[in-house]
Amino acid sequence: MKARLQTSLGQQLVMTPQLRQAIKLLQMSTTELEVEIAEAVETNPLLEWADEAAHAASDIAVDSSPSASTEQPQREEVAPAERDEDWSQDELQWTGSGSGGSFDDDESGDAAERVAESETLADHLLWQLHLSPLSPRDRQIGAMLIDALDEDGYLREPLSAILETLALGAAVDEADVLTVLHQIQRFDPVGVGARTLGECLALQLGVLDADTPGRELALQIVAGPLERLPRSGVAGLAHELKRSTADVEQAVQLVRSLDPRPGKQIGDLSQDTYVVPDCVIWRQRGVWRAALAGRAQPKVTIHRGYENLIRSCGESDAGYLRGQLQEARWLLKSLEARGETLLRVVRCLLEHQAGFLEFGAQALRPLTLREIAGELGLHESTISRAIARKYVRTPRGTIALRAFFASGIDTDSGGEASSTAIQAMIRRLIDAENPRKPLSDAKLADLLKTSGVPVARRTVAKYREAMNISASHERVRIA
């Protein structure tokens, strides 16, 4: 057996502070993003809104002499394409493949539409569950597990209690429940479905690249009793694990960057809220096009004259300003990555679901997160974050991006029909029924089968109930 050295090229995902910031911005809605950027502009002296900078530059040009203007700090809007040496776009694994786009319309009025949204953590997970390739039995188990999660995303009940609640008999054992739980633990946000804090952190570490610095040691730390960390400190933990203090410090910093309450990432909007579209879709000369809405890309600028500001300060203040400058650059790059990723996803959805926009829900094709992730070369969790609480304005109105995804059922013609399309077909049949003799679920199933879409009666009943349509005996109307 010979020892040999091998070298290989590849990309690795390192959970740097700037990457964590980019992930955080990606999963925000436009309204949340505006609040986040406003706070950054308020706290970072090197950031400023573009319109304020342009106004200040105009005042300088009109009111100042050429000699005086050189003494004023100049400002520029940092172009999205500007790169920082210590943080490349490749590190995000979200690089855009071409030109971006924005639709800078006036969205202060009608564009901010008031819609009812009440997405909870359970809603978010159930949506992913229905898109997963699971059997009806496993989906039932999954729904029960999701219902048992607390607001932080943890499963506090033992699997044996879940099994008793299911009441599926001897056909299901605890191992089956555990298998479905592992599937849920792969959903977004990463870390949900954990039974302990250590398991929650381990799940988040598990999605990082194997070469992430400190990952293996961090997994070892979270596998033990976490309460020993503040008690022992880094030095004590290094002695206990027989590792260097530097290695342990690196691993501890990685652990601290994780989210101990992943369920909180999904807000519970129990009341009506204003929704600002993130993208705009329109048809031009027979071709569907997409662009970012103006408010989806907050226009933030950075002072060009920051070097003069730093030179005029003392050493301690100059160090502070350098740190603020680095944070400002990271923020601008995170905004660029968010916009590029969102636009790539929307344009990919357009390629698959143009029929949905032209003809409505009955033309919606089966489409999963995995398919889009595979085409774009991204992780499923990235796609999930990119579409979470995101909306697109279309000729059919403002639509949630998640509405472009649907599970599918095989048809007699060898293709697939999405669950959304089947629901639209059921609604159309019911709308056209004789009010004196409403169609039963069995009759609806027969009519769908005649149309080449074989579905069981119980499936029809499930879809009908999901649309809040009463059973046939309750729909009887006497003229």
Curated annotation (Swiss-Prot):
Superkingdom classification of source: Bacteria
DNA-binding region coordinates: 368-387
One BP term from GO: DNA-templated transcription initiation
Gene Ontology MF, one: DNA binding
Residues spanned by motif RPON box: 456-464
Location of the region described as Disordered in the Swiss-Prot/TrEMBL record: 59-115
Key words, A-Z: DNA-binding, DNA-directed RNA polymerase, Nucleotidyltransferase, Sigma factor, Transcription, Transcription regulation, Transferase
Gene3D superfamilies referenced in this protein's UniProt entry, alphabetically: Homeodomain-like, RNA polymerase sigma-54 factor, core-binding domain
InterPro entries tied to this protein: RNA_pol_sigma_54 (IPR000394), RNA_pol_sigma_54_core-bd (IPR007046), RNA_pol_sigma_54_DNA-bd (IPR007634), RpoN_core-bd_sf (IPR038709)
Function: Sigma factors are initiation factors that promote the attachment of RNA polymerase to specific initiation sites and are then released. This sigma factor is responsible for the expression of the nitrogen utilization genes.
Protein name: RNA polymerase sigma-54 factor
The species this protein was found in: Xanthomonas euvesicatoria
Name of the gene: rpoN
